[in-house]
């Protein structure tokens, strides 16, 4: 994994964290410039995630012989354990300590749909969000993984074209009334941006440098700042792709940085568990009449330490053991390495 991309993935996760800080503690109301920035533009961390996901999946499967079902099994082992754990924790809080997450309502049927990545209206009535609200992005991720798995039926050089055509076809189907509105979101095309960056990287089209990539990042951030997400693919998706490309170009300045690499490893757990921690912090703040700044300052290290433990125990050890177990069950074929 490119360390520059790992660093960007960590940064994107924490941008989303502070976006939700503004939501949970301040209902997106802010007086300061930084507060408004996180409230109004912090969601762009998701766009960066999607571009990185397309890049990582493309690079991690190049030159490998793998069956569609094996690819999906790898992704399930990577995504599901931590997601199910934090979804169940959120469900328990909603069911038995609803005052911690008062905008939500518990519904078993909705929980089951959430666990299997099926978009459904949240019982709280605020949109197509799963029980663990941040899991809406994983519904898109699993959809992308499914399309990518199907792409293994064609030759490697045709996979990108296959996925583009499949997405275009699906977009046409998504206009039908029987199709969920969830899949009409243009954000799914940001995975394609990531795959295109993977092609460019493998072919040596992304030249290493420092000043030009920094200028690209600055221009991209200004674009994101000046435009909202009404045309998300253009206003946030394309600048996010340019930011990822610029970080790849600066890889020599990140290479061998173990701390940044580890922060990137922990980013998935940061993303999954941060809303639970923030909600608990908000509850304590309101009950004990504490200053929001004090509680937020306490929540940040709690999220960081919990994410580190989650990565080490669930994403790393549990997934590796599951990989070995499944590999033994599968016989000599084994599993391709997880990414």
Language-model segments: what does each one mean?
Residues 73:
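Phosphate-coordinating loops and pocket residues in cytosolic domains that bind phosphorylated ligands
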Residues 49:
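Structured binding elements
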Residues 1-7, 11-14, 18-38, 58-70, ...:
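Alpha-helical transmembrane segments in multi-pass integral membrane proteins
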Residues 76:
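Active-site helix-to-loop segments that bind/position phosphate- or nucleotide-bearing substrates
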Residues 24, 34-44, 52, 58, ...:
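Membrane-interface helix-loop-helix regions
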């Amino acid at each position: 994994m490119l360390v520059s991309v790992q660093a960007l993935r960590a940064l994107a996760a924490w941008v989303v964290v502070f976006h939700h800080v503004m939501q949970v503690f301040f209902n997106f109301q802010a007086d300061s410039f930084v507060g408004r920035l996180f409230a109004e533009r912090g969601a762009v961390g998701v766009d960066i995630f999607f571009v990185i996901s397309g890049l990582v999946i493309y690079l991690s499967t190049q030159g490998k012989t793998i069956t569609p079902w094996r690819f999906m099994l790898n992704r399930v082992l990577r995504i599901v354990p931590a997601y199910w754990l934090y979804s169940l924790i959120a469900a328990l809080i909603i069911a038995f300590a609803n005052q911690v997450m008062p905008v939500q309502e518990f519904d078993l049927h909705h929980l089951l749909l959430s666990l299997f990545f099926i978009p459904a209206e949240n019982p709280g009535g605020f949109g197509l969000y799963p029980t663990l609200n941040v899991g809406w992005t994983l519904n898109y991720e699993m959809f992308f993984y499914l399309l990518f798995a199907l792409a293994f039926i064609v030759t490697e050089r045709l996979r990108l074209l296959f996925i583009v055509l499949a997405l275009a076809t699906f977009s046409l189907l998504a206009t039908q009334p029987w199709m969920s509105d969830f899949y009409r979101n243009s954000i799914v095309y940001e995975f394609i941006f990531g795959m295109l960056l993977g092609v460019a990287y493998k072919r040596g089209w992304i030249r290493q440098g420092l000043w030009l990539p920094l200028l690209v990042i600055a221009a991209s951030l200004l674009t994101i700042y000046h435009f909202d997400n009404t045309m998300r693919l253009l206003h946030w998706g394309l600048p996010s792709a340019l930011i990822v490309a610029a970080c790849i170009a600066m890889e020599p300045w990140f290479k061998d940085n173990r701390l940044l690499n580890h922060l990137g490893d922990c980013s998935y757990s940061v993303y999954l568990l941060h809303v639970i921690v923030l909600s608990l912090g908000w509850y304590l703040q309101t009950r004990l009449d504490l200053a929001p700044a004090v509680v937020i300052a306490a929540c940040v290290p709690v999220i960081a330490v919990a994410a580190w433990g989650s990565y080490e125990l669930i994403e790393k050890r549990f997934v590796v053991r599951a990989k070995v177990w499944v590999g033994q069950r599968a016989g000599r074929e084994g599993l391709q390495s997880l990414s």
